[in-house]
């Protein structure tokens, strides 16, 4: 299973913001530049994470973005479920579009459902805080300036 770039960018944005001092605002452009990802795509991600209550967006000249919750309150599994638009691993997961003739007797579908549930269960064991415990390494890779720490 491959996560969409939308979910990938969502998680990366949350990690970046978790590494910031508590009330420091960051700009979407700054984050997009550091990660070398599309500003427009990251803007959409930012808007959605704001609607989900995960980040706070402040408009205006001195505005920016920051986490709206503590990093330990943001569950990775929940973020993935909220940002992935399709967790259907195979066609038969969708009753409306399923055309597979094996569906009535297929055991693979059950195995894949079980695998997806296990995947999500593992993700649900982690929060954003868990993913930034190696904060010094991450800061170095993201080239945080000493004054930002």
Swiss-Prot record:
Pfam families: Rrf2. Binds 1 [2Fe-2S] cluster per subunit. InterPro entries: TR_Rrf2-type_CS, Tscrpt_reg_Rrf2, WH-like_DNA-bd_sf, WH_DNA-bd_sf. GO terms for molecular function: 2 iron, 2 sulfur cluster binding; DNA binding; DNA-binding transcription factor activity; metal ion binding. It comes from the Bacteria. Keywords: 2Fe-2S, DNA-binding, Iron, Iron-sulfur, Metal-binding, Transcription, Transcription regulation. [2Fe-2S] cluster binds at residues 92, 100, 106. GO terms for cellular component: cytosol. Its cofactor is [2Fe-2S] cluster. Gene3D superfamilies: Winged helix-like DNA-binding domain superfamily/Winged helix DNA-binding domain. Residues 2-133 form the HTH rrf2-type domain. Residues 28-51 bind DNA. Nitric oxide-responsive transcriptional regulator. This is HTH-type transcriptional regulator NsrR. The gene is nsrR.
């Amino acid at each position: 299973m491959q996560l969409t770039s939308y979910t990938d960018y969502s998680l990366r944005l949350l990690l970046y913001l978790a590494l910031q001092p508590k009330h420091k605002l960051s700009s979407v452009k700054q984050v997009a530049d550091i990660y070398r990802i599309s500003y427009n795509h990251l803007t959409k991600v930012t808007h959605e994470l704001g609607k989900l209550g995960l980040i706070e967006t402040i408009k205006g000249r001195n505005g920016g973005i920051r986490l709206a919750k503590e990093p330990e309150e943001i569950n990775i599994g929940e973020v993935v479920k909220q940002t992935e638009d399709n967790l259907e691993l195979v066609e038969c997961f969708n009753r409306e579009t399923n055309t597979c003739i094996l569906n009535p007797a297929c055991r693979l579908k059950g195995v894949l459902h079980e695998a997806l549930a296990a995947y999500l269960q593992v993700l649900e064991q982690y929060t954003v805080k868990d993913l930034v415990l190696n904060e010094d390494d991450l800061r170095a890779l993201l080239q945080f300036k000493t004054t930002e720490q």
